[in-house]
């Protein structure tokens, strides 16, 4: 049966390839791949025992994990070359300050809004930490959470800011540190400023540098486009894995929390659309253009791996400035994450508060929580780890117990898909808003 399963998988891949060749519509093919993957994965889980299912997924993961690794491969070269190239072409370095402020302020404001929405959804759906099942998996997860809490306890804002400054740019280009992406952004920006300075002193030298950087940029972008064409197949394989490994009993047991989480995520997508409308961007057209990128973010559960798609979508489809697109995509992958850094920790903080005698819906607690969530979403870039670290930072800051994080481990992948898509959309929205405001 293994060979039959793989034959069907390959047949679906060929079908997607034929469809893409005929239509040349990447977004449409990605969406079809997502639906086919969901269907095929559900059939695999219901029809086969775990040993055969695991063997089938091992081969399917060659496509899914291979695609994710290809995207991870091009993240650092893309960020480095794109920002260096874009800055080398601009005339005023002070524009960098405006771009940084615009992107970061939009990310933090939308994170605060997402926290408020998360709080409201807990109240609306009456979600509580009481009665959650504690099994062996949950106990093991709680132990890991407490271990990670030790990494957060010594993290201060000054230490976090210092960690952004590149110490060894070559090590950062390998992604060796949690802050490597931001460090590469800073290094490439400084190198771009140095190129501008040389160009002012020696115009001929400046032109040669600009031509060399532009050639390198075109080479990297051609590689990016090669990888992006593989998106339908990567999304298809990733969706199979998700559907085939989801535990439906856990989904039923924690259904209320899942529904509340996705209601908050959906509402935040609406808020993003409203914000875009205010800067004269049609939300419907916007979401049509970004759907392939959101589909990949949803299935891969990786904001960092989505950076190449994010930048390509912003520049090629949304018309955003290259510098703004790079800053928004890279900062948005680590700072001001609307889903992992906003909605999720806010919901947990409200659910846990009654256990220690705090009224989670008092005005003072809500204001404090939103402020802590917004600031903490900036700080988690210093440690990495997404939603888990964000929740640890927020709960620790408020003096709340951390055990709830481990109790939700069984549904973490299901919720994380929606959170990651929202993170990526928040980054693209920040880039689009900043671009429209600075280029009026």
Curated annotation (Swiss-Prot):
Presence of keyword Nucleus: no
InterPro entries, alphabetized: Na-dicarboxylate_symporter (IPR001991), Na:dicarbo_symporter_sf (IPR036458)
Any one of the GO CC terms: plasma membrane
Protein name: Uncharacterized symporter HI_1154
Molecular function as annotated in GO: L-cystine transmembrane transporter activity; symporter activity
Sorted UniProt keywords: Cell membrane, Membrane, Transmembrane, Transmembrane helix, Transport
Subcellular location: Cell membrane
Family designation: Belongs to the dicarboxylate/amino acid:cation symporter (DAACS) (TC 2.A.23) family.
